[in-house]
Structure formats: C-alpha cells, structure tokens
A protein has these predicted regions:
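Extended, low-hydrophobicity, Ser/Thr/Pro/Gly-biased non-transmembrane segments
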Residues: 98-223
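Short structured motifs
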Residues: 18-25, 77-82, 171-176
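N-terminal, polar/Ser/Thr-rich
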Residues: 1-31, 145, 179
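Juxtacatalytic substrate-recognition/specificity segment
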Residues: 81, 189, 213-215, 231-273
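Asparagine-centered strand-capping/turn motif at beta-strand->loop junctions
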Residues: 40-44
Length: 273
C-alpha cells in the first residue's frame, strides 16, 4: 500500500527522460551492486523543479553525483526525488551507485493485496476490464507461489518490473494499468565476476577481461538480466544467430527434433520472409 501511496503522490509531475544508461553490475549472494552513468534530459515545455527517478526500495543509494558534485534527494519507497531544478531542454549527467537486495513487493502494484498474496490466483492475459483498471483473474487448482525476481549464486533473474535499474517512468500506471509508458534508452550493461555462467541480456554480447558486456545499436524501452548455469544451442541463418538456453541435461526436446539443420534454416528463412 505504501508504494502505491508514494507513486500516486507524484503521478501528475512532469518527468524527465533517461537518454542513456551505462551500468556496471556485480553481485554477491543475494546482494547486488550497480554503478550507473545516466544522461537525463528535460523534454517538457516547462522547467522541472524536482526530477523524479524510480528504483527498487530494497536498493540503497550509496552516492548520487553530477559532474563531481553531490546532489541532494529525498526518497519515499521506490520514488527518488532530486532537489535539483532542470530547465527546458537541459541535460543532466548523473553518476549513481546503489546496492542491496531486491524487494519483490514493488512488482505489479496494480494488483490488489488479495491477488498479490494469493498463491492460487492467476492473471488472465489480455483480459483487463473495460476501464483498464484491473486485470481479471482466475483461481488456480494448484498453489504455484509467486516470485517476481531472484538474485543468487546459482541463478539470477531480473525483469524491468522489479526496478533493478534506475528509471524515469513509474513501474505501472495505477489509474489505468493497460496504458504502458516507456523511455527509449541507450543501454550498456557490463556484468563482472560471473565466470563460468551464462549471462543473458538484450543487445550484442562481448567478453572482456572483466566479464561480459552488452551494447545496443538502438535505444530500448526496457532491460532484463538472467545469469545461471545454462547450456546453449544456436543456429545461424543469413548471418542472424538464433539461440536457445536450457538447464544442463534438459535437452530432451532435441531427441524429438527431426529436422536437419538445413531444413531448419529454410523454415526460419520462410518465417522471416
């Protein structure tokens, strides 16, 4: 409830846009540490007195600076309110370090407390009510539980909904959840200290002496990260590579795969047009 209250308080504020976000990601156990270089811009038609960013409430800000100067800010849950006015068209570079554990309670604030905590409640896709305020649900036969993020030595899964990186867009529109809003940001991600594990994210992957990095030729609306002991099978069609990651020993699906590599390439080419 407190996260909804905090978000509604600043819902009508004009927002900045994050043009670029360069991140260096590390983790130890269930704790993560991120150093982020951001470029903010005010594209609105008026000055913004207190630019707002959003970050998972379980992640504490170690430092927040701009061009070597500490910036004052207030924080209410996942809402970070900076005490620094931005004029129309102004760009503001930020250097932010944050660390901690992921608080999954920030995910899917549009769900009622009953739906969020009911482990037998499943959300029906594409079935929002006519007003767009709440998704419809069904009662499942089995109790599947609900996890929206995981950070650990064996496996890590971080989706945009858990606010594992700084965003200028709130995680959900509480008035009308079906209305999605995104920033298109130039993301660059470097993951350190995960030797021997598969590191999966959006973009072009490169290995270096520190770890694995991902860069993108075009701005993206959001970013995910998955780390774990995965095996991979790939096929290349017209210089475009397709890959499947799976748990070790779980390649049973390959035995029933009767298409040759050449036939599979033709099938993919036909689908791509």
């Amino acid at each position: 409830v407190r996260f909804r209250i905090a978000q509604e308080k600043y819902m009508k504020n004009d927002r900045v846009q994050i043009v670029s976000n360069r991140m260096v990601y590390k983790q130890s156990g269930n704790r993560l540490n991120v150093k982020s270089l951001l470029l903010l811009v005010n594209k609105s038609k008026q000055p913004i007195d207190s630019p707002i960013l959003y970050l998972n409430p379980g992640l504490g800000i170690v430092s927040l600076t701009s061009e070597g100067q500490e910036l004052a800010y207030n924080r209410e849950g996942h809402v970070v309110v900076m005490n620094r006015k931005m004029e129309c068209g102004e760009e503001l570079p930020l250097r932010v370090e944050y660390e901690g554990t992921i608080d999954e309670a920030i995910c899917y604030l549009e769900l009622s407390d009953e739906e969020y905590h009911n482990t037998r409640m499943g959300v029906l896709p594409f079935s929002a009510d006519p007003s767009g305020k709440m998704p419809k649900t069904r009662h499942e036969l089995y109790s599947n539980g609900g996890r929206f993020a995981h950070v650990g030595n064996k496996y890590t899964i971080l989706l945009p909904e858990c606010l594992w990186y700084l965003s200028a867009v709130p995680p959900v529109n509480l008035q009308m959840p079906s209305m999605k809003d995104f920033d298109f940001t130039d993301y660059q991600l470097e993951v350190e200290g995960q030797e021997g594990k598969a590191v999966i994210s959006q973009g072009c992957m490169e290995r270096n002496e520190k770890g694995i990095s991902y860069s993108n030729a075009h701005p993206l609306p959001r970013l995910s990260l998955c780390i774990g002991d995965y095996e991979q099978k790939t096929i290349t069609v017209d210089s475009l590579s397709f890959g499947v990651y799976y748990f070790p020993g779980h390649d049973f699906w390959v035995k029933d795969h009767r298409l040759s590599s050449d036939s599979l390439r033709l099938l993919i080419s036909d689908q791509l047009g």
